[in-house]
Amino acid sequence: MKLSMHKSEVDLLIDKTKKLKISSDNYESNNQNVENYSMSIFIVGLPRCGSTLVESIISLNTKVKDLGEVNIFEESYREFKQSEKRKSLSEIYWKKLKITDSKTITTNKWLFNYQYAGIIAKAIPNAKIIHCYRNPLDNILSTYRAHFATGNNFSSSLVDSAEVYSDQDEIMRTYKKEFKNHIYSLNYDKLVTHPSDEIKSLIRWLGWNWNDLYLSPHLNNRKVSTRSNVQVRSPINTKSLGCLLYTSDAADERLR
């Protein structure tokens, strides 16, 4: 039913990943001193991967400005190419952020920035990329059941969803080998099962001082406009684990 209403764009999405990997390979690294720049956090993955929970945890830091799901980096990259590289990509990106305080830490939760992870690591000084992922069958079935307002048409098909999951998993494995100091792997299943250990590990990687408040993201009163709004208003729990018990053989076969 969903597929008849929304044509999947899976081939275009996977082709884009490949092209941006080539662009990343050809991009000259930015060797600026990271100490002169505030931290830019990019939360990446696929829809329904636990990213909203992670964003809620991080934004409990009072120095963090939560940008939400904004496609600013891709817009900046297009402008960078159109300007024939007269301006630096980081300069264009920060101008679009409209941040007046240079000490402000930002979180950008445009999930498909996973395709740009290599370019981000090279272009944005002090960039931190958090890759959120979960059990693939849980993730695939969760996106299939969801009804997104716009985009994510690949979720109309279990097979296409599996293709996209495999694509982002493969490219992130590659980028993690190349930019291991820039990318943090966050397993949603572990996060909700052992929240204290996983959250402390994340905060330590970010180089922040510990605060017990990070264990209570449901107390964060920030506005959440995604489908995860209800979930993040509740204490961390494991209710969303185990969707794979009801999945189809089609997605399972594609991931083998």
Task: Describe each region flagged by the PLM.
Residues 2-7, 149, 208-212, 256:
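Charged, solvent-exposed alpha-helical segments that act as regulatory interaction surfaces
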